[in-house]
Amino acid sequence: MNPSQILENLKKELNENEYENYLSNLKFNEKQSKADLLVFNAPNELMAKFIQTKYGKKIAHFYEVQSGNKAIINIQAQSTKQSNKSTKIDIAHIQAQSTILNPSFTFESFVVGDSNKYAYGACKAIAHKDKLGKLYNPIFVYGPTGLGKTHLLQAVGNASLEMGKKVIYATSENFINDFTSNLKNGSLDKFHEKYRNCDVLLIDDVQFLGKTDKIQEEFFFIFNEIKNNDGQIIMTSDNPPNMLKGITERLKSRFAHGIIADITPPQLDTKIAIIRKKCEFNDINLSNDIINYIATSLGDNIREIEGIIISLNAYATILGQEITLELAKSVMKDHIKEKKENITIDDILSLVCKEFNIKPSDVKSNKKTQNIVTARRIVIYLARTLTALTMPQLANYFEMKDHTAISHNVKKITEMIENDTSLKAKIEELKNKILIKSQS
């Protein structure tokens, strides 16, 4: 089968805008291709990178199904200057809109769990259904750093670009610097044209707009004009609108006028799914015990977790050895130690007692009341998981006879967790609260 025909056949699998904007610009490079390597030329580096990331595997799979042969797909930038003139899509327009957008940040690569499904659902709905934009406008996504807010924001951007929409993505810092630069150059008209004449405006870390009243005034008018023109606005922040410091009341009111969706730290099963997805994307193979170790040993910052995965792969590649659990522990030991130094057993005891509405002195006593025993075991379990305290040190803290009593409590609570999903969820929630507090 002619590889060029593969792209034509793929047209049936994609929407018209998606095909016309991207795959229709590819040209099969017969000279550089081989039996097991198919090379396609894209108009420029930006397009090549985007298409390789988003469609490379899909093209390879489609080729195998249609021809019965396997081949690696390589999308590269066409070297001739003439290529930019022949493309059906305005490349300069795309670069101006989406240079900052990460093509790997898509809805397909986002791992959905209980902690983020509302935010995910809202963003995906407006990205694919224009009518919902009028109802869900603006969308305000908030939560701690590193949990996927930027991923969702850029997923909306990438999906909107595929539909031929004009997208502007900017962090608050980008927005402020853009305004300041145009103000100094006497070119505010250029600034206004850029931000007001878009279909979709994506603002990351909107909480940092509160630096000056002038910046907020500019954003207020831009916000109103986009919304009045039926444009879509999505923002992210670390806190909900009513808790934003330095932001004017009229802006807070605008932010809260649509959907407010929070993203919370993921539960263990979602963390494991995220790690698997990151491994798949980076083509890294990790065993289940290593994945579980990473998930239970690190906090919930997804960028941090991905950094560890890439570091593990780098160590293994450079040293020429397999990624083992021992290697993982060695690579992660300083990182885990740093985390644990920020968490004390007193912090854990205080939070657990507050959750169970009991006194710390009761937990540290010999009382055998069921809720006190359970709380005590949870404190011990979390202390073993989140701190560097040894069993003898914990035995001393609880004034127990020796460390075997601590070991017994750890064994009991572990069995309880395995058989009680609600208890497992509660402990995971407590763990996340402690980790968030330690990082603040």
Swiss-Prot record:
Sorted UniProt keywords: ATP-binding, Cytoplasm, DNA replication, DNA-binding, Lipid-binding, Nucleotide-binding
InterPro entries: AAA+_ATPase, Chromosome_initiator_DnaA, Chromosome_initiator_DnaA-like, Chromosome_initiator_DnaA_CS, DnaA_C, DnaA_dom, DnaA_N_dom, DnaA_N_sf
Region named Domain III, AAA+ region: 100-316
GO BP terms: DNA replication initiation; regulation of DNA replication
Main location: cytoplasm
HAMAP family: DnaA_bact (MF_00377)
Name of the featured protein: Chromosomal replication initiator protein DnaA
